C-alpha cells in the first residue's frame, strides 16, 4: 500500500509520517518512510539545491522538471521495488504538492502539471492508495516553522502564496473525496494518527 502525507508548511507532515511508520511497525507491518523532494541520492541532491534560499533563483518550469526528474528516480529506484516486495510505503509529499506549488501557486497550470505528474513514469498513472491532508491555517503553520528553523525558499514566501497552497490542497481533496482523508493540523498528532490508522485498516480490508 502507498500512503502519502500532504499539507501546508508547518502542518506536521513529517512528524505524522514518522508516527504512522512506527505504529505500523509495532503492528508487525513492513514499512518504509520516504520524502519528496528526496527519497533517493539524486532526489536529495535536487532537494538541497532547490530549497537553498542562498542560491540564485531558477524559473518555475526548471523547478518543475527538476522535481519531476527526482520523482521519476524515486519511484523507480525506491517506491516500486518496496511495493512489489509487499512493504507499505509512506511518503511525505508527492504529486499533489507539485500540482499545488508549481501548477497553482506558481501559475504553470493545474491540468498541465497534473498530467505530467500522473504520467511521470509512463502512460499508466502512478497514484497513491490514500492521501492524508493535514490542513492548518497558514499563519499558524508558518509560526510553527519559524520556531523550528530558518525558513527555506518556499516557506519564506508571502502569506498570499501560502493561502493559494492551502486552497489548492483543499480543492484537490474536495474533488477526490474517495482518495483523500482531511485532518485538522491544529489537533494533537495522535488524534490524526488514529484517523489515518482507521482509514488504512478500511482500505486494507478492501484490497
From Swiss-Prot:
Listed GO CC annotations: cytosol
GO BP annotation list: dTDP biosynthetic process; dTTP biosynthetic process; dUDP biosynthetic process
Binding site for ATP: 7-14
Keywords, sorted A to Z: ATP-binding, Kinase, Nucleotide biosynthesis, Nucleotide-binding, Transferase
Reactions accelerated catalytically: dTMP + ATP = dTDP + ADP
Alphabetical list of Gene3D superfamilies matching this protein: P-loop containing nucleotide triphosphate hydrolases
Statement: the UniProt record of this protein carries the keyword Transport: no
GO MF annotations, alphabetized: ATP binding; dTMP kinase activity
InterPro entries recorded: P-loop_NTPase, Thymidylate_kin-like_dom, Thymidylate_kin_CS, Thymidylate_kinase
EC number: 2.7.4.9
Record carries keyword DNA-binding: no
Family: Belongs to the thymidylate kinase family.
Role played: Phosphorylation of dTMP to form dTDP in both de novo and salvage pathways of dTTP synthesis.
Protein name (database record): Thymidylate kinase
Species whose genome carries this gene: Chlamydia felis (strain Fe/C-56)
Lineage of the organism: Bacteria, Pseudomonadati, Chlamydiota, Chlamydiia, Chlamydiales
Gene from which this protein is expressed: tmk
Amino acid at each position: 500500500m502507498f500512503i502519502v502525507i500532504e499539507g501546508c508548511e508547518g502542518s506536521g507532515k513529517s512528524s505524522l509520517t514518522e508516527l504512522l511508520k512506527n505504529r505500523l511497525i509495532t503492528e508487525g507491518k513492513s514499512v518504509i518512510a520516504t520524502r519528496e523532494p528526496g527519497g533517493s541520492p539524486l532526489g536529495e541532491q535536487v532537494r538541497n539545491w532547490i530549497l537553498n534560499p542562498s542560491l540564485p533563483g531558477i524559473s518555475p518550469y526548471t523547478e518543475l522538471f527538476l522535481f519531476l526528474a527526482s520523482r521519476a528516480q524515486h519511484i523507480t529506484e525506491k517506491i516500486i521495488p518496496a511495493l512489489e516486495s509487499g512493504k507499505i510505503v509512506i511518503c511525505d509529499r508527492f504529486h499533489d504538492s507539485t500540482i499545488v506549488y508549481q501548477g497553482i501557486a506558481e501559475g504553470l497550470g493545474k491540468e498541465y502539471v497534473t498530467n505530467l505528474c500522473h504520467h511521470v513514469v509512463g502512460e499508466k498513472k502512478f497514484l497513491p492508495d490514500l492521501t492524508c491532508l493535514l490542513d492548518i491555517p497558514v499563519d499558524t503553520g508558518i509560526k510553527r516553522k519559524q520556531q523550528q528553523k530558518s525558513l527555506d525558499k518556499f516557506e519564506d514566501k508571502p502569506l498570499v502564496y501560502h493561502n493559494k497552497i492551502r486552497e489548492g490542497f483543499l480543492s484537490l481533496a474536495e474533488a477526490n473525496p474517495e482518495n483523500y482523508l482531511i485532518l485538522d493540523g491544529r489537533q494533537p498528532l495522535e488524534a490524526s494518527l488514529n484517523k489515518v490508522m482507521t482509514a488504512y485498516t478500511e482500505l486494507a480490508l478492501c484490497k
